[in-house]
Amino acid sequence: MCSRDMDRGCAWESSEVGRLRGMSACAEPLSVAPAPEDGLALRFYEVTSADGTVLRAWTNDVEGPVLLLCNGLGTNPYAWPSLLDPDCGVRVVSWNHRGVGGSARPTDPDRVGQEEFVEDALAVLDDAGVVACAVAGWSIGVNTMFELAVTRPERVTGLFALAGVPGETFGSMGAPLFIPRFARKPIATAVARLLGLVGNPLHRVTSRLEIGPCAGRVVTHSGFMLPVTDEPLARLAIREFLTTPTDWYSHLALASSLHARVPLHSIDVPTTFVAGRYDVLAASHDMRTASERIPSAQYVELPGSHFLQMEKPREVHALLLELLDRVALRG
């Protein structure tokens, strides 16, 4: 698993965004990975979703079983250090959300709900020539993962839920802060709406923030996030996250807040839930009770926050590989 502590520049990132947006979906796959000395297995390319929205997809091009990753809302590959390790043993395919990280906004701005995210996931699978595979989800991506598993079960062979619940996500926020359950969704929704109201002025500030070593340590020792194993890569993940306009992020979040709890009785594939004990965005209790509704599902709780794959990459990756072994044994 990746635990390098070298600084990684991101100048290559901004220089390629314009070219990515101008390429057609059928163009030659783009080689825009960081320099080889950075040690990251990462390549971006374009995929067109069912409604014509052009997505910025990515893969690590690693030999191994295929894993579709439904990432956290508005996040990026750099939040997954273990999956960017050339020796991780897992071939990942994923994409950046609509209007995020080089993916276009849809013509209809309301097409940003979980149903559309499932369409995007299917487009990525189809483009990669993958008939069915295991699926991992993080945070809001757990909603997408379970929605895909329920609506298109023939495409899913296993499920790995990290720091997320299968729907009704806003109702799971704030548990470690002792916010009563009845108040969690109203408070989370109010915060998301406030971000939308102050979006443009706030984005002008956050998009100019220098996320250097000191700022990075403040974030990773804030309690919201706990200390990480790869600080340079975490800083890159934070910098990239802050490039998304705040009002658009609010729009995406509010759309996902409408996603109801997914019924789990039909899930019949190997499933693992990995929760963070101190996660303020996805209550570990809710993840545990969700796991109890799926026969033979495994539940693991780690001493970490919402960002377990950055704080405990070795442990999370080992659990992922164990899930993939169960999928392989099932055939």
Where would I find each of the regions flagged by the language model?
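The conserved beta1-alpha1 loop
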Residues: 68-72, 138, 275
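Catalytic histidine-centered segment of alpha/beta-hydrolase-like enzymes
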Residues: 281, 304-317
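Conserved alpha/beta-hydrolase catalytic His-Asp/Glu region
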Residues: 170-171, 197-265
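Short beta-strand/loop motif that positions the catalytic acidic residue
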Residues: 267, 273-275
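Conserved HGGG/HGGXW glycine-rich cap/lid loop of the alpha/beta-hydrolase fold
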Residues: 53-105, 124
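Conserved alpha/beta-hydrolase "acid-adjacent" motif
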Residues: 280-286
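Flexible "cap/lid" loop of the alpha/beta hydrolase fold
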Residues: 157-202
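Active-site loop/oxyanion-hole signature of alpha/beta-hydrolase fold enzymes
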Residues: 94-140, 144
